[in-house]
């Protein structure tokens, strides 16, 4: 769990940061309304899922990573415990919270692994 500061996530979530939680696809199930879930293929690495009925943004599937980024606010029972900031070089909202801040992404996720200061 963490915060993404990239321009794309900020625009998609209409917020200065996007709180995310990462899951394996096999660990996820849409409990109800699955017939209303639509997908927009932004890039080969990002398949955005949203509700056709209300327009709410739900999650991003990242097939190249084998992970799904479920927006933390869409899981009412989730105890959000952020552990990292990604794409902090693009931030518009500085956060002093002691968490690691990656310039882009960790190396395991295709980034530089470079850290930036708070």
List each model region and its residues:
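A short Gly-Trp-Pro
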Residues: 1-118
